[in-house]
Amino acid sequence: MTQNWIDAACLDDIPEGDVVGVKVNGKEIALYEVEGEIYATDNLCTHGAARMSDGFLEGREIECPLHQGRFDVCTGKALCTPLTKDIKTYPVKIENMRVMLKME
């Protein structure tokens, strides 16, 4: 599959220590700012249809607003029940203050 870097957001639109939801090529993505780095995952929880961008970000962990399961936003790893499936992550790079995602 061909992967392309896609412009997802302005870096300034992602508050420090917070999460925002964006739509990239029709797909919902959550963007996180953690200790000066930007991370990206699917925006929908793997357990339910909750948006991760509505969740609570604490350090590297995002808590799903529906059932309080937690994911590591850097790796996508599901950290506790009721989650059993990891969340998809996307490579990120910053170019000219734009957040670029590598998507399939």
UniProtKB/Swiss-Prot annotation:
PROSITE patterns: RIESKE. Disruption phenotype: Cells lacking this gene are not able to convert salicylate to gentisate. InterPro entries: Rieske_2Fe-2S, Rieske_2Fe-2S_sf. Pathway: Aromatic compound metabolism; naphthalene degradation. Binds 1 [2Fe-2S] cluster per subunit. [2Fe-2S] cluster binds at C45, H47, C64, H67. SUPFAM superfamilies: ISP domain. GO terms for cellular component: catalytic complex. Keywords: 2Fe-2S, Aromatic hydrocarbons catabolism, Electron transport, Iron, Iron-sulfur, Metal-binding, Plasmid, Transport. Residues 6-101 form the Rieske domain. One of its GO terms (biological process) is salicylic acid catabolic process. One of its GO terms (molecular function) is metal ion binding. It comes from the Bacteria. The keyword Magnesium does not apply. Its cofactor is [2Fe-2S] cluster. Ferredoxin NagAb belongs to both the salicylate 5-hydroxylase (S5H) and the naphthalene 1,2-dioxygenase (NDO) multicomponent enzyme systems. The NDO multicomponent enzyme system is composed of an electron transfer component and a dioxygenase component (iron sulfur protein (ISP)). The electron transfer component is composed of a ferredoxin reductase (NagAa) and a ferredoxin (NagAb), and the dioxygenase component is formed by a large alpha subunit (NagAc) and a small beta subunit (NagAd). Component of two multicomponent enzyme systems which are involved in the catabolism of naphthalene. Plays a role as an electron transfer component for both salicylate 5-hydroxylase (S5H) and naphthalene 1,2-dioxygenase (NDO) systems, by transferring electrons to the oxygenase components. Belongs to the bacterial ring-hydroxylating dioxygenase ferredoxin component family. This is Naphthalene 1,2-dioxygenase/salicylate 5-hydroxylase systems, ferredoxin component. It comes from Ralstonia sp.
